[in-house]
A protein has these predicted regions:
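Acidic catalytic patch
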Residues: 36, 104-119
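Amphipathic, well-packed alpha-helical segments that form the structural scaffold of globular domains
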Residues: 27, 31-34, 100, 104
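Helix-adjacent hinge/juxtasegments
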Residues: 65-106
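Short, contiguous alpha-helical
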Residues: 2, 16-30, 37-78, 116-166
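Exposed loop/turn and edge beta-strand positions of beta-sandwich/beta-sheet ligand-binding modules
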Residues: 9, 43, 82
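Short, low-complexity N-terminal intrinsically disordered segments enriched in polar/charged residues
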Residues: 2-13
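Hydrophobic packing residues in well-ordered alpha-helices of helical domains and bundles
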Residues: 15, 19, 85-92, 96, ...
Length: 166
């Protein structure tokens, strides 16, 4: 897939808006995980709620940083997860703001430049914003299922929930 600089900038405007619309919803789900439930696991193969939260946070920031850098670094943990949901939510908010500011500063040519994704695919940088969004939504959905199963407050996402009806 090839994009001109102008096409990449137009697509970026659309996709950045999507990421910035979804991020506050993800933040709301992260904040809803009770601190005393961080060890909760849904099923034998599930991650702990805390591990799932930290993976979501780090991955979203990793995508934004990789897009801005024009290359995806080897995925490695950036330290231990913060102790509380509040601290994790703050880390998400800060990291996403910084990463997306870098993406917004990219030129059309930078947005159009292909990035190799582990020799699986090579797409224009801007298209990975959709991967960021999809990945975040996927794990946010998992976390909302954890919240319901642990009998915690489930925030509204696109419409009302039993705990936050419209």
């Amino acid at each position: 897939m090839m994009l001109s600089a102008e096409q990449a900038q137009g697509l970026a405007m659309f996709l950045i808006h999507g990421v910035e619309t979804e991020a506050p919803i993800t933040k709301k789900i992260l904040a809803a995980v009770p601190n005393d439930q961080h060890g909760y696991v849904l099923g034998e193969k599930g991650r702990t709620a805390k591990d799932l939260m930290w993976h979501t946070i780090q991955s979203d920031i990793w995508f934004a940083e990789g897009i801005a850098a024009g290359a995806f670094a080897a995925s490695e943990s950036k330290g231990d997860a913060p102790a509380t949901s509040e601290e994790m939510t703050a880390a998400y908010e800060k990291g996403m703001a910084e990463g997306m500011a870098k993406v917004k500063a990219m030129t059309g040519a930078q947005l159009a430049k292909p990035i190799n994704f582990y020799n699986i695919m090579e797409l224009p940088a801007v298209t990975y914003l959709q991967f960021l969004s999809n990945h975040s939504i996927h794990h946010r959905g998992q976390l909302s299922s954890y919240l319901r199963a642990m009998n915690a407050h489930v925030p509204s996402i696109y419409g009302g929930s039993a705990d936050e009806p419209m």
